[in-house]
Design a protein with these regions (language model features):
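Short, solvent-exposed coil/turn segments at beta-strand boundaries
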Residues: 23-28, 51-58, 78-81, 153-154, ...
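C-terminal structured interaction module
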Residues: 161-178
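Short N-terminal edge-element motif at the start of the domain
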Residues: 1-55
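Secondary-structure transition/turn motif
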Residues: 34-37, 64-67, 88-92, 161-166
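Hydrophobic residues positioned within well-ordered beta-strands of beta-sheet architectures
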Residues: 31, 46-50, 61, 158, ...
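Solvent-exposed helix/loop surface patches that form functional interfaces
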Residues: 2-19, 24, 74-159
Length: 178
């Protein structure tokens, strides 16, 4: 399957907006997101690009974070087996075993685990993820649980629980049927 989809999100609380472009290729999927928001009373713009294999495992993550004092970048590769490497720092051993990335500033990254798991009604899964906190741009492993409540032709209703208490905003206009 090839093609492209464009999606917009807005947080329920606070100020912000995200534009996501999801592009399906023959052998991989690319998500490009542009998030604008406010953190600690300061505006920021986060641009990310995530390349996944067809099993929705993160293989490459590129981040650009624009703040009042300039731009910071982060470039990470993953082997799809739970090993992560930052371009300048080398191996990120604290993330060993994490297959999915979750960027705090976007709801999209929860989709990666959902697509990979393909939960059916009544099923749930607990997993460890590589959590990227924005605007700090710091990684740490976190535990999350996903439960599929029911499935409709256009998508599924899924409950997301952050078992490690790393908080994130709640977003509206989340699309279904991917």
């Amino acid at each position: 399957m090839t093609g492209e989809r464009s999606i917009f999100w807005q947080p329920w609380q606070g100020q912000g907006m995200e534009h996501l472009r999801l592009t399906y290729h023959e052998d991989h999927v690319v998500a490009r997101g542009d998030v604008q928001g406010i953190a600690a009373l300061a505006p920021f713009r986060l641009r990310y690009k995530i390349k996944c294999d067809l099993g929705w495992r993160t293989r490459k993550l590129d981040i650009e974070l624009y703040e009042l004092h300039g731009c910071r970048e982060l470039h990470v590769k993953a082997d799809g087996q739970g090993n992560w490497r930052e371009e300048e720092l080398g191996p990120l051993s604290e993330l060993a075993g994490c297959l999915d990335v979750d960027i705090s500033a976007t709801p999209f990254t929860n989709t990666l685990a959902l697509r990979r798991l393909n939960l059916q009604p009544g099923e749930n899964a607990a997993l460890n993820i590589a959590y990227l906190k924005v605007p700090e741009l710091t990684f740490h492993p976190a535990s999350q649980r996903y439960s599929c409540n029911w499935r409709a032709p256009t998508g599924a209703i899924v409950t997301y629980e952050d078992c490690s208490a790393a908080s994130r905003p709640t977003w509206r206009s989340m699309p279904t049927g991917w």
